[in-house]
A protein has these predicted regions:
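Interfacial/gating helices of multi-pass transporter permease domains
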Residues: 42-63, 132-135, 258-278, 347-352
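Membrane-interface junctions at transmembrane-helix termini in multi-pass inner-membrane proteins
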Residues: 147-169, 360-387
């Protein structure tokens, strides 16, 4: 389907699509900033010791469950959109919610009753102090993580009604409320205050979208035609999260290989990855969320899917290029100011370079976030688990070769290569003819954005110091994008505006 054949939509609805994407993206940025503030405060307040090791071990459990919640938003929106069209959205929402509560309640009770045992289990050979802190945090972090899953479900139900702002506000206010709580109570209660703050975060994230759902008349009574099907719904969550969890596993593998390249490189790669992930998710993840419902209603074929991926990636990577250029020039200074002198000098500069080396991963991850919901819109889910397993397996030899050739730089490149292979597999699973069209389109726009970023920020850095070069580079980058708009950016913007 050609771009000029797409339904253009009214100007008001075009503004609605842009507003929805902007609010969703700003919500994700707010959450990321809140997490950064919490991390910086934790580092300055508590340092790096046995207690923080124990808390971070428990926090890893929370992260895995929250990642599943984020993936579930991409999975369930098509289901709820079809339910809305058939007049059974409230019933479908209730069935999913009951299924998740049926797991959340016993899991939370187990985390509370057996907290000491679980604290020792997840901290392994760490000292007893670490296990004690983990045991304090787990009874709060487990229900907090399930709260994020229910919040994702409520946000998806609103998305089925083309309503994105309430959920975006709920997630953003939850992130802010959680970090404020942590800062206020850290002195008197220690690290467990962060676990309490995350629980408050989840409560706020659930509360606002739930109130909006109820006010808009979605009764949560059970519909006779909507069975609970607990195992089916939990299985849908598990296989829907398989590929996102596998891609997170690639990052864990990258950290393991980075550990063999020198002291401190794991930390540097971690921060570079978090920055790169924030840039991509704030744009590509937001576009994926606001497009799933309209694409489900409209229907999409292989050509339409390819067009959707390329156009959405154009918008995402245009912003990512600017962010990456800024980090390359001034990221080290910002990190030093936030995290302290341990990241000053060459360490900070290296972090900026790592973000640049993660450019292939950013392109691949943007394509993944945009493509993945299409698997559920088009009912092409049979190969998700095999693709997830294959990605984990092939990443190890790729990482071995790349690290032996280029060290830490090779580790970042291997992460991008394997992620790209998984994305290409997803595209082939959607439709073989989509693979070629999308690969060509993504390759073309990657070259355009990469050239504009290198010319603008690299050129400015040759004649100016870091901060003035960043400002001048950003201005020149914007000019170059305007000059290149006829190479696809203008059509991509028009496409996104017509989504709603």
């Amino acid at each position: 389907m050609l771009a000029d054949e797409q339904p253009k939509g009214s100007p008001a609805r075009g503004r609605s699509a842009v507003r929805s994407g902007a609010f969703t993206g700003l919500s994700y940025v707010t959450l990321s900033l809140a997490a950064a503030v919490a991390g910086a405060f934790l580092a300055h307040k508590f340092g790096r010791n046995r207690e923080t090791d124990g808390f971070m071990a428990a926090y890893g459990v929370y992260l895995v469950l929250v990642l599943g919640a984020q993936a579930f938003r991409m999975v369930v929106v098509p289901d709820l959109t079809r339910a809305e069209a058939e007049g059974r959205l409230g019933s479908e929402f209730r069935a999913y919610a009951l299924a998740f509560v049926a797991v959340a309640v016993p899991a939370s009770v187990i985390a509370w009753v057996f907290s000491d045992f679980l604290g020792e289990l997840i901290t392994g050979r760490l000292p007893e102090d670490s296990a004690h802190v983990a045991a304090q945090a787990l009874p709060w972090l487990v229900p907090a993580a399930f709260a994020q899953l229910i919040a994702a479900l409520a946000a998806s139900a609103l998305a089925a009604k083309d309503s994105y702002v309430p959920a975006a506000l709920g997630f953003a206010l939850g992130g802010i409320g959680g970090v404020v709580f942590f800062v206020l109570f850290a002195d008197s209660h220690g690290l467990v205050a962060l676990a309490w703050g995350l629980t408050l975060n989840g409560a706020i994230a659930i509360g606002l979208p739930m109130v909006v759902l109820l006010v808009r008349g979605n009764r949560l009574r059970r519909h006779r035609g909507v069975p609970l099907r607990l195992r089916y719904r939990l299985w849908r969550l598990l296989y829907g999260a398989a590929v996102p969890l596998a891609l997170q596993g690639l990052y864990v593998i990258a950290l393991r290989f980075a550990a063999g390249t020198g002291e401190g490189n794991v930390t540097s790669l971690s921060y570079a990855y978090l920055l790169a992930a924030t840039f991509v998710s704030a744009t590509a993840f937001s576009l994926a969320l606001i497009s799933a419902a309209p694409l489900t209603r409209r229907g999409v074929d292989a050509e339409g899917a390819a067009e959707h991926v390329v156009h959405s990636a154009w918008i995402s990577l245009a912003f990512v290029g600017a962010a990456a250029g800024l980090v390359a020039l001034v990221g080290g200074r910002v990190v030093t100011a936030v995290l302290g002198d341990a990241f000053s000098g060459n360490v900070g500069d290296e972090l900026g370079r790592l973000v640049v080396y993660l450019s292939p991963w950013m392109v691949a991850n943007a394509a993944f976030l945009i493509t993945y919901p299409l698997m559920f819109v088009m009912h092409r889910t049979r190969l998700l688990i095999p693709l997830a397993l294959a990605g984990m397996i092939v990443d190890i030899p790729i990482s071995i070769v790349c690290r032996s050739l280029w060290g830490l730089t090779g580790v970042t490149l291997a992460l991008g290569v394997t992620t790209l292979l998984v994305v290409l597999g997803l595209m082939a699973a959607l439709a073989p003819r989509m693979l070629f069209v999308t690969a060509v389109g993504l390759g073309r726009l990657s070259l355009l954005v990469g050239a504009a970023t290198a010319l603008a920020f690299g050129g400015a850095s040759l004649v100016l110091s870091a901060v003035p070069a960043a400002a001048a580079g950003l201005a020149l980058y914007a000019v170059l994008l305007v000059a290149m708009r006829q190479f696809g950016l203008a059509q991509a913007w028009q496409y996104v505006r017509a989504l709603h």
